[in-house]
Regions:
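Short, small-residue-biased leader/transition segments that mark boundaries at the very start
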Residues: 2-7
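Amphipathic alpha-helical segments that line or abut small-molecule/effector binding pockets
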Residues: 52-67, 147-150, 154
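Short alpha-helical scaffolding segments that buttress acidic/His motifs in well-ordered protein cores
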Residues: 76, 131-135, 153
Length: 158
């Protein structure tokens, strides 16, 4: 799980660096790996058929991420963005873009959303942005209770 496990297995920390062009690249790959572990696709695909179920799942995964990697969400960008800011920002944007696309897909697939919930001014993409912003805010506040977000979803979409 960390350097302690590397030492136990008698792996030279320096040898790990040989696989990457820079420390920033190593940290970036590690951050991506952690994000992927936290938000890995669940066994139950029903999670992505319903916005409320998806939001609950996302907040559960955020709580899991906090338990497994304390401080990761609030500090992850600092380490890999210092040395190579452009690459770090690009990496973070790719991860976030993937999450946003997933939210859009769920919003498009949820058959319980009332007709007319979306229009030209209030699109699926804009609501996905709102949900994502609420998620990022929850991450920074370490607040993994989705109740308020679920109520917003219920009142807005159903």
């Amino acid at each position: 799980r960390g350097l302690g496990d590397v030492y136990k297995r008698q792996v030279s920390v320096g040898s790990i660096y040989n696989y990457y062009d820079s420390k920033a690249e190593l940290i970036s790959a590690t951050v991506e790996s952690v994000w992927c572990e936290i938000f890995h696709r669940p066994q139950d695909e029903a999670v992505f058929q319903d916005v409320q179920t998806c939001v609950k799942w996302m907040y559960e995964r955020m709580a899991y991420g906090y338990e497994q990697y304390p401080g990761f969400f609030t500090l992850h960008s600092l380490g890999f963005m210092q040395e190579d800011k452009a690459d770090g920002k690009r990496q973070m944007q790719q991860i976030w873009h993937h999450i946003l696309n997933g939210l859009c897909t769920v919003l498009q697939q949820d058959t319980k959303i009332r007709p007319g919930a979306f229009n030209e001014q209030f699109t699926v993409e804009k609501f996905a942005d709102v949900l994502f912003s609420l998620m990022l805010s929850a991450l920074l506040r370490q607040d993994y209770d989705p109740a308020a977000v679920l109520e917003i979803v219920r009142r807005t979409l159903y």
